[in-house]
């Protein structure tokens, strides 16, 4: 690792520890030339995932787009910023684990809906209204009724 002050490539590791919930390793280093101490992070390089759009085009998976869409759906709900980040990380992990290189945008949308439904019904309705392009009140009512029906089924299975 190159020293940020003298650009020497020889350094020794003083300390290593897991960081970012085990997704990276934080290393404290010391330059053998100038004794400057600095921190580096080591992460696994993931294979890029391509998203196949409805119009047939292809683009690289963008975690920020996912975060933005879910954040909008979760505005003014009890979802904290940290919970949204964890939710997005979970969706990203599922996408990376379940796909080789390509995933349809519709699969991502359905995966988000499936997970949002379990976490927060308001965020689910908001996301569904945009993703499924609700045209009117009837679309909201039918989605609310399906939520209401699944809630009754869950209560019946608990009893």
Swiss-Prot record:
A zinc finger (unnamed) spans 3-34. Coiled coil: none annotated. The gene is nrdR. Residues 1-21 are annotated as: Disordered. Residues 1-11 have a biased composition (Polar residues). Keywords: ATP-binding, DNA-binding, Metal-binding, Nucleotide-binding, Repressor, Transcription, Transcription regulation, Zinc, Zinc-finger. Residues 49-139 form the ATP-cone domain. One of its GO terms (molecular function) is DNA binding. Belongs to the NrdR family. HAMAP family: NrdR. PROSITE patterns: ATP_CONE. Its cofactor is Zn(2+). It comes from the Bacteria. InterPro entries: ATP-cone_dom (IPR005144), NrdR-like_N (IPR055173), RNR_NrdR-like (IPR003796). This is Transcriptional repressor NrdR. GO terms for biological process: negative regulation of DNA-templated transcription. Binds 1 zinc ion. Negatively regulates transcription of bacterial ribonucleotide reductase nrd genes and operons by binding to NrdR-boxes.
């Amino acid at each position: 690792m190159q020293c940020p002050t003298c650009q020497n490539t020889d350094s020794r590791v003083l300390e290593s520890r897991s960081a970012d919930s085990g997704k990276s390793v934080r290393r404290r280093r010391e330059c053998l030339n100038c004794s400057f101490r600095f921190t580096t992070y080591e992460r696994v390089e993931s294979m890029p995932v391509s998203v196949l759009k409805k119009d047939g085009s292809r683009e690289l998976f963008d975690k920020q787009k996912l975060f933005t869409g879910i954040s909008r759906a979760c505005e003014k709900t009890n979802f904290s910023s940290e919970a949204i980040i964890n939710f997005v990380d979970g969706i990203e992990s599922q996408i990376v684990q379940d796909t080789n290189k390509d995933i349809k945008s519709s699969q991502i949308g359905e995966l988000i809906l499936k997970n949002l439904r379990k976490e927060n019904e308001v965020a689910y309705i908001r996301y569904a209204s945009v993703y499924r392009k609700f045209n009117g009140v009837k679309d909201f009512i039918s989605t609310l009724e399906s939520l209401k029906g699944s809630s009754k089924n869950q209560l019946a299975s608990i009893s």
